[in-house]
C-alpha cells in the first residue's frame, strides 16, 4: 500500500518560520528535525541548523521569534494543524532501510503473550534469509490508517537507530499487515513477575538494580530527545535469567499521540492517568519531565511488588489529590532515601523535577547494605526476622538500634537488632548510607622529654585467650577518628623505609583511643563506651587504685584515659548529672583555673609538688587538700532565718570569707555519699515550716548553697579561685524575695544575735534543725500558726525595732527593700485582675497602706483566728453610688477574721503616698486579688463553685485608717478569699458542686450577674421568658438574631463568608470546619465542589443576612438558646424579607406563574435552588448568569456548568463542554471524568 508523503504541523510552527524568513527551510524542520509542534523547537540545536545551511544571523532571528511567540502563547487559542507535503527533491531522511523491511512470509505467529492499548503481542519465529530461526515478539497494530502508517515509518526509523542494552531491540517492520518485530524477552513483564505468588520473592537488592537499569535507559532516551510517554512496570520486560530488564513501547506512544484525536475521549483503560503528571492530564503535554514523573510511579510499583497506584480513584480524583499536595504513600519494603527519590520525581512544577542523571546518582547513594548474622536470633516479637548464624541479610533501613532487612535464604522481611549482624562495610556504598558522625574533639599533643622515662604501662584490654571468636568479633568497631598513628613507613624501592612493628612504644599499643567510629553508630558495630565494658559485660566496675609516690613524682601530663562516662546515653541511664563532672586540678603552686581540660602553662615550665598524702573521692578521682584556703565569693543573697522589718531588709555582703570555714573541719570525715541528700534537704527545706525557696547555684562565684565547705578535700569543679571579693553596697536597690521561716513561740532571741548564731551554726546541724522544726510545726498544737498562702499583704505598720514572734501568717512572701540610689520614684504598675463570675460587691481599688501604731496580735491569737474563722456573709445589694474603701492591715481584736476584709465607707481626701507605700500597695493589690493556692488547686470548703465574698463591718477598721481615709476608684475588684481551716488536709476530699447556668426557658426570671470585662459598674440583667421586639430596627433590618447564632456561624465574619442555614447558623463559603450533628451550621470545605467564596455579596445576599445588633446576653458568659417562637419569628421575617427583595423586578413570565398558583416557586426560591446546585462557583456568577438568561435559572445552571469545565481546563471550548454535559445528562463530575478519559 502506498503511503502518503506529508505530515500535520501546527500553524504556529509555520508562523515562526515565516516571520524568521525561513520559508526555504520548512521541509527540513518538519521532516528532518521532526518539528511538528511549537515545543519541538527546544530540541533543535544550533549545530544541526548549521549543517543544513543556515547562517548565524538566521539562527539568531529564529531564536528571537521563538522567544516572542512563547510570550504570546498564553493569550492564543489552540493551534490548528496544517498538512505539509514533503519535498520530493529532499532525500528521504526518515525512510526505512530495505534491510529493516521484513517480508510477511518470514514471520510465523504463535500464541498471544500480551495485549496493549494500541496493539496485541504474539510470540513468533522469524526465519531469516540465511535460514536462521530467531524467536521474536510481534506487535500487531490495531489501527492501520494512513496517518498511523506514516508515523509508524518515522518512528521505526528512529527505533532502528536506538541501540541500548536496556532497550528492547527492533528487528524490523512488516508493511502488510502493519506489524513490528521485536526481540523476545522470555522473562515476561516485570509487573507479572512482581505479582506472581508461585515464584520466590525478589530481593530488594535486585529491585534496586532494576531501577538502576531503567533510569539508565531513560537517560539514554533523554539524550536522544525521545520521550517515552508510557513508563510503567507493565512496559518493562525481563530476560530469561531475570537479571536484565528492557523497556518496550518507547517511541510508539509518542508516534501515536502526535495526533491529538488519539488522546482525547479515549476509554479509561487506555489512558494511564495514574502514571501521568498533572500537566499531561490537563494540557496533553509530554516531555522528559513527564517521563520522570512516570518513572517515580514505576519504582513505587516495583517496591510495592506490583500494587496499583491510586487504586479505586478516577482520573479527576487523582488530579484533585495531586493538586492538594497528596502523593503515594511510602512502600513498606523500601528505604527512606529511595522514597525521597520518588518524591523528587513527583514535584508539581516540571522544572523542579530531577534529571535522570541525578536520579542515578541518588540510587547509587541509596544502595542497600549486605550483612552477615554473627549469631542466631530467634524472637517471638511480631515482625521480627529470624536469623541463623551465617545468614546473609539485605539491610533496608539501618537507623536506630533495630534494623529492617530481608533474609536472602528465605526472602522474608523483618526487624532485628543491629548487634546480631556484621555489616560488610567494605562495600563502596557503606559510607554513603551511614549518618555523618559528630565531630570528636581531638586530644592535645603530648610531648614527653626524652630524659624522663615513659609512663607506667597499663593493663591490656583483654588477655582472656579462651574467648570465642563470636565474642571477639562482636567487640570490633570501625576505626576511631585520630586513632591512626604513623609509627613506621615502608618503601617498595628501598632506602626510605623506617620503623619496625616490634619496636612500637607501649604507649601507642596499650592505650586505646575511644570515640565515635567513622561509620557512626547507625551503620557500624556497637561503640564501646569505656575499656572496662569489654570484660565486664557492659557495666563498668572501675575501681582505681592509689598510685605510688614514684609515679606521682613524674611529670604530669594529660591522660589518654577518657572519663568513665564518655557515652551520654549510658551516663544518663545511670543517673549521671553534669554537676558531678570532676575536672582535673593542676599540681602547681598557684591555683590556676582549668577550662575544658587544657592548661595554659607549658609542660616545660611545670613544677612538680610532692603531695603530703593521698585521698580519693567516691568516684575514684584523685583529690588533694588545699594548701591555703582559697578566698571565695559569699552568696549575694543569704537567707536569714529571722527578718525584723521592711525598713531593715537590706542585704549586706560579708568581706571576710574566713568566717564561713569556722566549723567545717570537724565534719570533713563525713561520708561523701550523704552530700546529695543534704544538698536536696537544704534546697527543699521544710515544705510546711520555713518555706525557704532554693536559690540558683549555677552562676560562677556562688557556692552551691554553702555545701562546698562541708568537705574541703572534695574538688569542686565549678568554683572559681583567686578571685577577689566583689565589693557591693550595703543595701541592694531591688525587690528581693525573702523567706518566711516559722519560729517557735518561746524563741525570742534578738535579731542581731540570731543572725550571728545562724552564721556560726554548722550547716548540717542547721539543716537537721530546720527539718525537725518543720516536723514539729506540722502537729496541730495550740501555738500553730495558719500556713501562709504566699499572697498576704506586707506588714508595713510594724516598727522596725520591734521584736515579736514570727509566724508565717504575718511574714509577707514578697517584701520590698529600701532603695537608696534611685532618685526617680517607681511608678505604680497596673495589675489586670481576672474577671469573676460570683455575686460580689462592687469592684473597688485597695488604697496604699498607711503607717499606724497598732499592737500586733500574738501567734496564739492568730492561730485561734485561723481555727475559728467567721463565716462569710452575703453581699448587700449593689447600688450605683460611688463607694470608697480603706484596707485593713491588722486585726486589733480576735473577733476579726485572719483573712483580708474590705469595708465600704465614704472618704473625701486623697493621701500622698511615698515610694515605699506605693510598693507596699502594689504588693497588697496582688496578694488580695489572687486567691489562695489551696483554693485554686484543691478546692475550698464551700460546696459552691464560686468563692464567697466576706462582708466587712465598720468595727474592723483601725482608728488610724479612719483618720486617714484614702479615696479609691470602684473600677478594679477586690476579691476576698474564703476562710481556711487550720486542720484542713492537703488534698481535700470534698466534691465541688457545679453551678447551674441560667436558661431562657425557665418560667420565672432569674438575675444573672455579668462578668466584669471592662472597668464599669456591674449590672444585673433579668432575662425574660418571652422575646419582646424592642430593639431598634435599622434601614435594611428585617429581623434580629442573637449574637450567639451569628458568632457560631463560621470562622470569619458572617457578612462576608456565610449565608443563612434556616436558623441553624450560617454555612461557610470559605475554609470552615466539618459538619457535625451537634454543631449545626458548619459545613466542610470542598476544594473542587465549592468555590473559594466571594468577598462582596450581592444586594440580595446582603439583605438576607441579619444585622449585628448587641443583645441582652452579651456579657452573660453563657449562650441563651432561642425559643420556638423566636425561631419561627426569625424564619418568617427572613423569608418575607428575602422574598420582597428578590421579587422587586421579576420577569413577566415569572410574575405570572407566581401569581397563578401557590405551588409554583418564587424567584427567591429558584435562586436558592440555583445557589445550592451551583455551589462550585460564586453567587455573583450565578446572579450574572441569571441576568443574562432573563431569569431562566435552569439555563443559567447549564451555562455555569459549561463555563466551569472550561475554567478548569477540562474542556477546550464551551461547545466541547456542552457535548460532554449532554452526554452525561448534565452530571458535572461524570462529564469531567469523561473529558479526562
Curated annotation (Swiss-Prot):
Domain of life of the native organism: Eukaryota
Polar residues composition bias: residue spans: 749-766, 778-791, 847-863
Chain segments carrying region Disordered: 683-704, 741-802, 826-919, 940-986, 999-1018, 1134-1156
GO molecular function: ATP binding; non-membrane spanning protein tyrosine kinase activity; protein tyrosine kinase activity
Active-site feature positions: 230 (proton acceptor)
PROSITE patterns attached to this UniProt entry: PROTEIN_KINASE_ATP (PS00107), PROTEIN_KINASE_DOM (PS50011), PROTEIN_KINASE_TYR (PS00109), SH3 (PS50002)
Catalysis performed (reactions): L-tyrosyl-[protein] + ATP = O-phospho-L-tyrosyl-[protein] + ADP + H(+)
A GO BP entry: regulatory ncRNA-mediated post-transcriptional gene silencing
Keyword Cytoplasm: yes
Enzyme class: transferase
Keyword Cytoplasm tagged: yes
This protein's domain notes: The kinase domain is required for import of dsRNA into cells.
This protein's name: Tyrosine-protein kinase sid-3
Source organism per UniProt: Caenorhabditis elegans
Lineage: Eukaryota, Metazoa, Ecdysozoa, Nematoda, Chromadorea
Amino acid at each position: 500500500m502506498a503511503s502518503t508523503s506529508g505530515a500535520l504541523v501546527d500553524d504556529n510552527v509555520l508562523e515562526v518560520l515565516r516571520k524568521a524568513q525561513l520559508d526555504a527551510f520548512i521541509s527540513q524542520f518538519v521532516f528532518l528535525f521532526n518539528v511538528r509542534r511549537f515545543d519541538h523547537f527546544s530540541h533543535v540545536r544550533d549545530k544541526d541548523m548549521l549543517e543544513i545551511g543556515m547562517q548565524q544571523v538566521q539562527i539568531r532571528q529564529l531564536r528571537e521569534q521563538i522567544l516572542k511567540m512563547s510570550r504570546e502563547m498564553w493569550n492564543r487559542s489552540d493551534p490548528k494543524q496544517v498538512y505539509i507535503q514533503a519535498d520530493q527533491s529532499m532525500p528521504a531522511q526518515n525512510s526505512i532501510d530495505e534491510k529493516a523491511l521484513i517480508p510477511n512470509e518470514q514471520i510465523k505467529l504463535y500464541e498471544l503473550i500480551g495485549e496493549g492499548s494500541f496493539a496485541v503481542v504474539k510470540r513468533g519465529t522469524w526465519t531469516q534469509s540465511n535460514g536462521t530461526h530467531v524467536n521474536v515478539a510481534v506487535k500487531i497494530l490495531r489501527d492501520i490508517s494512513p496517518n498511523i502508517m506514516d508515523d509508524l515509518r518515522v518512528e521505526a526509523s528512529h527505533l532502528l537507530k536506538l541501540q541500548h542494552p536496556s532497550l528492547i531491540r527492533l528487528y524490523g517492520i512488516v508493511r502488510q499487515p502493519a506489524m513490528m518485530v521485536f526481540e523476545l524477552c522470555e522473562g515476561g513483564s516485570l509487573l507479572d513477575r512482581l505479582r506472581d505468588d508461585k515464584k520466590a520473592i525478589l530481593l530488594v537488592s535486585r529491585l534496586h538494580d532494576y531501577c538502576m537499569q531503567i533510569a539508565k535507559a531513560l537517560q539514554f532516551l533523554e539524550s536522544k530527545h525521545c520521550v517515552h510517554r508510557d513508563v510503567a512496570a507493565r512496559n518493562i520486560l525481563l530476560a530469561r535469567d531475570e537479571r536484565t530488564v528492557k523497556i518496550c513501547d518507547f517511541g510508539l506512544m509518542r508516534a501515536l499521540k502526535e495526533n491529538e484525536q488519539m488522546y482525547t475521549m479515549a476509554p479509561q483503560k487506555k489512558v494511564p492517568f495514574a502514571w501521568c503528571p498533572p500537566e499531561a492530564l490537563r494540557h496533553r503535554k509530554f516531555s522528559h519531565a513527564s517521563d520522570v514523573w512516570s518513572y517515580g510511579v514505576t519504582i513505587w510499583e516495583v517496591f510495592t511488588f506490583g500494587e496499583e497506584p491510586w487504586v479505586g480513584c478516577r482520573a479527576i480524583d487523582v488530579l484533585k489529590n495531586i493538586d492538594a499536595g497528596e502523593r503515594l504513600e511510602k512502600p513498606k519494603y523500601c528505604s527512606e532515601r529511595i522514597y525521597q527519590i520518588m518524591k523528587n520525581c513527583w514535584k508539581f512544577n516540571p522544572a523542579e523535577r530531577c534529571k535522570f542523571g541525578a536520579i542515578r546518582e541518588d540510587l547509587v547513594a541509596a544502595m542497600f547494605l549486605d550483612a552477615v548474622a554473627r549469631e542466631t536470633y530467634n524472637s517471638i516479637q511480631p515482625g521480627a526476622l529470624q536469623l541463623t548464624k551465617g545468614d546473609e541479610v539485605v539491610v533496608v533501613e539501618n537507623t536506630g538500634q533495630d534494623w529492617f532487612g530481608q533474609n536472602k535464604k528465605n526472602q522474608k522481611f523483618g526487624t532485628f537488632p543491629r548487634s546480631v549482624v556484621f555489616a560488610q562495610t567494605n562495600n563502596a556504598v557503606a559510607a554513603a548510607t551511614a549518618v555523618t558522625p559528630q565531630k570528636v574533639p581531638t586530644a592535645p599533643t603530648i610531648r614527653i622529654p626524652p630524659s624522663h622515662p615513659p609512663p607506667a604501662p597499663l593493663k591490656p584490654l583483654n588477655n582472656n585467650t579462651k574467648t570465642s571468636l563470636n565474642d571477639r568479633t562482636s567487640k570490633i568497631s570501625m576505626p576511631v577518628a585520630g586513632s591512626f598513628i604513623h609509627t613506621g613507613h615502608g618503601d617498595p624501592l628501598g632506602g626510605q623505609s623506617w620503623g619496625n612493628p616490634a619496636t612500637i612504644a607501649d604507649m601507642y599499643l596499650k592505650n586505646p583511643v575511644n570515640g565515635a567510629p567513622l561509620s557512626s553508630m547507625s551503620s557500624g558495630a556497637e561503640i564501646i563506651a569505656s575499656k572496662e565494658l569489654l570484660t565486664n559485660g557492659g557495666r563498668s566496675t572501675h575501681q582505681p587504685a592509689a598510685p605510688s609516690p614514684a609515679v606521682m613524682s613524674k611529670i604530669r601530663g594529660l591522660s589518654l584515659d577518657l572519663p568513665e562516662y564518655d557515652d551520654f546515653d549510658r551516663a544518663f541511664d545511670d543517673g549521671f548529672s553534669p554537676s558531678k563532672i570532676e575536672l582535673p586540678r593542676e599540681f602547681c603552686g598557684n591555683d590556676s583555673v582549668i577550662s575544658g581540660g587544657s592548661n595554659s602553662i607549658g609542660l616545660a615550665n611545670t613544677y612538680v609538688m610532692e603531695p603530703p598524702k593521698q585521698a580519693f573521692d567516691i568516684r575514684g578521682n584523685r583529690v588533694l587538700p588545699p594548701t591555703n584556703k582559697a578566698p571565695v565569693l559569699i552568696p549575694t543573697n543569704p537567707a536569714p532565718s529571722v527578718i525584723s522589718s521592711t525598713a531593715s531588709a537590706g542585704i549586706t555582703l560579708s568581706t571576710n570569707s574566713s568566717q564561713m570555714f569556722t566549723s567545717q573541719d570537724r565534719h570533713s570525715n563525713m561520708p561523701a555519699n550523704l552530700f546529695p541528700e543534704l544538698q536536696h534537704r537544704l534546697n527543699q527545706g521544710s515544705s510546711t515550716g520555713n518555706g525557704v525557696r532554693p536559690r540558683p547555684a549555677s552562676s560562677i562565684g556562688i557556692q552551691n548553697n554553702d555545701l562546698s565547705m562541708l568537705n574541703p578535700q572534695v574538688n569542686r569543679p565549678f568554683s572559681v579561685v583567686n578571685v577577689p571579693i566583689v565589693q557591693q553596697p550595703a543595701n541592694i536597690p531591688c525587690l528581693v524575695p525573702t523567706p518566711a521561716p516559722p519560729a517557735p513561740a518561746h524563741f525570742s532571741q534578738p535579731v542581731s544575735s540570731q543572725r550571728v548564731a545562724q552564721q556560726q551554726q554548722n550547716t548540717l546541724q542547721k539543716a537537721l534543725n530546720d527539718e525537725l522544726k518543720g516536723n514539729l510545726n506540722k502537729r496541730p498544737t495550740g501555738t500553730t500558726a495558719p500556713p501562709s498562702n504566699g499572697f498576704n499583704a506586707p506588714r508595713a505598720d510594724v516598727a522596725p525595732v520591734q521584736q515579736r514572734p514570727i509566724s508565717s501568717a504575718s511574714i509577707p512572701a514578697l517584701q520590698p527593700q529600701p532603695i537608696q540610689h534611685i532618685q526617680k520614684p517607681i511608678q505604680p504598675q497596673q495589675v489586670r485582675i481576672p474577671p469573676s463570675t460570683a455575686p460580689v460587691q462592687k469592684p473597688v481599688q485597695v488604697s496604699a497602706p498607711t503607717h499606724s501604731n497598732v499592737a500586733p496580735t500574738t501567734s496564739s491569737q492568730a492561730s485561734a483566728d485561723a481555727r475559728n474563722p467567721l463565716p462569710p456573709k452575703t453581699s448587700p445589694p449593689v447600688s450605683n453610688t460611688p463607694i470608697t474603701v480603706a484596707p485593713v492591715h491588722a486585726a486589733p481584736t480576735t473577733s476579726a477574721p485572719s483573712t483580708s476584709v474590705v469595708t465600704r465607707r465614704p472618704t473625701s481626701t486623697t493621701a500622698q503616698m511615698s515610694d515605699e507605700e506605693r510598693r507596699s500597695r502594689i504588693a497588697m493589690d496582688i496578694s488580695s486579688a489572687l486567691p489562695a493556692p489551696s483554693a485554686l488547686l484543691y478546692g475550698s470548703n464551700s460546696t459552691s463553685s464560686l468563692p464567697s465574698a466576706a462582708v466587712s463591718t465598720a468595727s474592723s477598721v483601725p482608728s488610724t485608717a479612719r483618720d486617714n481615709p484614702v479615696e479609691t476608684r470602684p473600677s478594679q475588684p477586690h476579691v476576698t478569699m474564703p476562710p481556711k481551716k487550720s486542720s484542713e488536709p492537703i488534698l481535700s476530699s470534698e466534691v465541688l458542686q457545679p453551678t447551674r447556668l441560667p436558661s431562657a426557658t425557665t418560667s420565672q426570671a432569674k438575675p444573672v450577674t455579668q462578668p466584669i470585662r471592662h472597668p464599669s459598674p456591674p449590672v444585673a440583667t433579668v432575662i425574660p421568658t418571652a422575646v419582646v421586639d424592642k430593639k431598634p430596627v435599622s434601614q435594611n433590618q428585617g429581623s434580629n438574631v442573637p449574637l450567639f447564632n451569628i458568632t457560631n456561624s463560621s470562622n470569619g465574619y458572617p457578612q462576608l463568608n456565610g449565608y443563612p442555614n434556616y436558623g441553624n447558623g450560617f454555612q461557610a463559603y470559605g475554609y470552615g470546619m466539618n459538619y457535625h450533628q451537634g454543631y449545626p451550621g458548619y459545613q466542610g470545605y470542598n476544594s473542587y465542589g465549592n468555590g473559594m467564596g466571594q468577598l462582596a455579596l450581592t444586594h440580595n445576599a446582603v439583605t438576607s443576612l441579619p444585622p449585628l445588633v448587641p443583645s441582652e446576653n452579651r456579657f452573660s458568659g453563657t449562650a441563651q438558646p432561642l425559643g420556638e417562637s423566636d425561631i419561627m419569628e426569625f424564619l418568617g421575617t427572613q423569608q418575607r424579607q428575602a422574598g420582597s427583595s428578590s421579587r422587586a423586578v421579576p420577569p413577566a413570565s415569572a410574575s405570572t406563574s407566581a401569581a397563578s398558583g401557590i405551588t409554583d416557586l418564587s424567584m427567591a426560591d429558584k435562586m436558592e435552588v440555583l445557589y445550592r446546585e451551583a455551589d462550585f462557583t460564586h453567587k455573583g456568577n450565578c446572579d450574572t448568569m441569571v441576568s443574562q438568561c432573563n431569569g431562566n435559572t435552569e439555563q443559567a445552571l447549564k451555562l455555569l456548568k459549561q463555563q466551569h469545565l472550561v475554567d478548569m481546563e477540562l474542556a477546550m471550548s464551551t461547545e466541547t463542554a456542552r457535548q460532554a454535559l449532554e452526554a452525561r445528562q448534565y452530571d458535572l463530575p461524570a462529564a469531567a471524568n469523561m473529558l479526562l478519559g
